Amino acid sequence: MSIENFPSLNSEEFTEACHHLDRQYCQAPLGSERARWKLRLCNALCTDFSYGGGFTTYVQIRRPLEFDLDHGDLSLDLDGFSFSDEKGPHVSIAEDKDMLDAEEADEAALIRQRARPEIAMVEYEIHLHPTYRVPCLWFTLRNLPADEPAFDVDTVFRRLVPDEYKAGLRTLGNVGGISADHHPITGVPSFFVHPCLLGDAISKFECDRTNYLMIWLGLVGGCVGLWVPKEMAMQ
């Protein structure tokens, strides 16, 4: 489980580290948090030959930017619901009507569900950087309002970066801070946290393939609003 040239990783070591992070996620007792903080292990053909080409393993994490506790419009669906046991003389007719009303309500609920706008979210991805040979955190904002550009650094600072990180990231600029480039899988312009300063920070920790990405996320993720559930850290 050791890392040959720590903190640098080769492709095999990074792939194994991704599998360990995925297992921690699958085994953690996340409860309801699992519905909004989603992690999955991915394999894809890398289109950027600077990343080595061929198939690559990476980790994708998604979370909502705004979480509505009434997601699903339950308050609207339950407006006409009653627990009353009172029954009139025309019970069968009333029940038939109730059944028809329920079917119509179900259809209306489905229409509302289809029409409901998609939730704004952030999608993070962990890839092995081809030059620095350490994990690199990419991220993309999705389903933002039409008047809010997703590929805009001001939007990133407003939506993702906690106040305590803003001054430091702006001082670092494009080297050591938030940078933009073509995504290694899709080729679409995307943001990433520049990995050049990671080596000094993570070298202070005792890492192997089983815990490397958990420690790395603790060092890197917070500056763009990515926090690992504590249940995963306890695995």
UniProtKB/Swiss-Prot annotation:
Disulfide bonds: none annotated. The active site is at residue 196. GO terms for biological process: autophagosome assembly; autophagy of mitochondrion; protein modification by small protein conjugation; protein transport. Its main location: membrane. It is a peripheral membrane protein. Disruption phenotype: Significantly decreases the radial growth of colonies under nutrient-rich conditions. Pfam families: Autophagy_act_C. It is found in: Preautophagosomal structure membrane. One of its GO terms (molecular function) is Atg12 conjugating enzyme activity. Keywords: Autophagy, Membrane, Protein transport, Transferase, Transport, Ubl conjugation pathway. GO terms for cellular component: cytosol; phagophore assembly site membrane. It comes from the Eukaryota. It is an enzyme of class 2 (transferase). E2-like enzyme required for the cytoplasm to vacuole transport (Cvt), autophagy and nucleophagy. Acts as an E2-like enzyme that catalyzes the conjugation of ATG12 to ATG5. ATG12 conjugation to ATG5 is required for proper localization of ATG8 to the preautophagosomal structure (PAS). Likely serves as an ATG5-recognition molecule. Autophagy is required for proper vegetative growth, asexual/sexual reproduction, and full virulence. Autophagy is particularly involved in the biosynthesis of deoxynivalenol (DON), an important virulence determinant. Forms homooligomers. Interacts with ATG7 and ATG12. Belongs to the ATG10 family. This is Ubiquitin-like-conjugating enzyme ATG10. It comes from Gibberella zeae (strain ATCC MYA-4620 / CBS 123657 / FGSC 9075 / NRRL 31084 / PH-1). The lineage of its organism: Eukaryota, Fungi, Dikarya, Ascomycota, Pezizomycotina. The gene is ATG10.
